[in-house]
Amino acid sequence: MKKARVFMVWLCMFLVLLVGCTGNQNTKSVSENKTEKEEVKEEVKEEVKQDVKEDVTITYLRPGTEVENNGELLQAINDKLKADGMNLKLEIMYIPSDVFQDKLNMMLSTGDEFDLLCIMEDQKPFTSFVANEGIIPITKYVEKSKNLNRVIPSYMWESATINGEIYTIPANWCETADQNCCITFRRDKMKEFGLEDPQTKEDLLNMCKIFAENWKGENKPVVIPMYKEPFNYLFRTLDTYPFTVQKDLFFIDQQGNVKNWMETEEFKQCAEFFRELYEKGYVPEDVLSSGWSSWKTMLTGDFIWVDQCQLWDTEAIWEERIPGVELDTIYLNPKAPIFRMASFRNDTAVSSTSKHPEEAVKFMDWLYSSQENYDLMVYGIEGVTWKNEGGNQYTKIDPAFEFNPDWMIGNLNYIRYQKGTYEKFIDIMGKEKPEAQNAIGLNFVFDPSAVADEYVTCQAEVVQSVYPIKLGLVSYEEGYKAALERMKAAGIDKVIEEYQKQMNEYLKQKGNK
């Protein structure tokens, strides 16, 4: 019995030791397993971290000044980019409009990094940026885009292409046919003075005379010339119309003949007309000074007419600016054909200093992928900066607010018009004109690289030598010879010759010659 009891004690001790050893082994094993799991977890985390791309910041360079709630608006765009899985962030760099081109040129020359560039064809065309290597080809990125090719017509892409390479993204924000071939005046004053709509140059001169004789107020009314662009509205009164004038350098008729604009009879007729306007006091004395502003002059209400369709904003806003005003826009010589001189007026290109050209184009594709994205970029935050009025109409909560205006980066597929916008503005700017006659070189793009120095010099010389004659400040008879000599010294003949050569090749490819 005693032996049996001893045996039982020994057996219990053995089992305890056995369980203890086994327990220790299990504890060690669990600990080891835990360590292995943690290691695996860390490896997975590292792999995920490597797979998640860091956001690329896209810097958009544009003229203008920052709006008050710019940070909030940008954050809304960036939040939407993140929600859409774009791995992109937008940053907007503003340069005051009056120094935009000078500052931009300096930034490009010093290699300052930015990605997207707002281009205004009336001030400096994208071809000039190509010539000085300020922008780069983006063909391979555009070809991958689903939305850019959907919302921008093929004829615009053709006009954005040089030697088979796309260099810029057109802003398809308006119909360009006859878009800048009209004038805007005060209909209220036309009624008051008993005037009919002008149709000829003589009618315009008479209109000026009647306005000046009957005007009440401290300041006399003036003509407001948008002189950095050709006076297309005036061309409609000439017998040889339609034709195209580009940059006050090139005259192109509908047969594809290219001439130095200032050497044409058409230039002479327009210059003599403006000389008469100037001598009679209808053109501002300081029109070429850096301080003169067409916009500020228009806001005074003391004007006879201003070039192009200027029915921007609503009728109510204009009534606040100029009490009693009734603006209207008309075409001279209504019998002249509807004419499309250019494919687009504004565009967005990728800077040669960009480190993220593909991502920059992806942002543009994202912008045009939905109404929501477009609204955020152009109008801001619904309920904060604008109110949806249904259809394609909206109301600005602050009438003076402007984020990234349609004319910079807009598209007809998404554009909204303020409630109360002039119907004529929508008719002129927003409705396609399939019956329009296209310029023979509509999709021709001049490549100035072979005459890059001469081309840049000629553009600068136009400002110094041609503008004063164009505006009538210097008479054609007195200024023409010296101005032409300076243009020829700048290399205009060589530039015209190269332009004609390329135009001939273009027309030959199209089967026109």
Task: Please give the residue ranges for each predicted region.
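Extracytoplasmic/secretory soluble proteins
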Residues: 3, 10-513
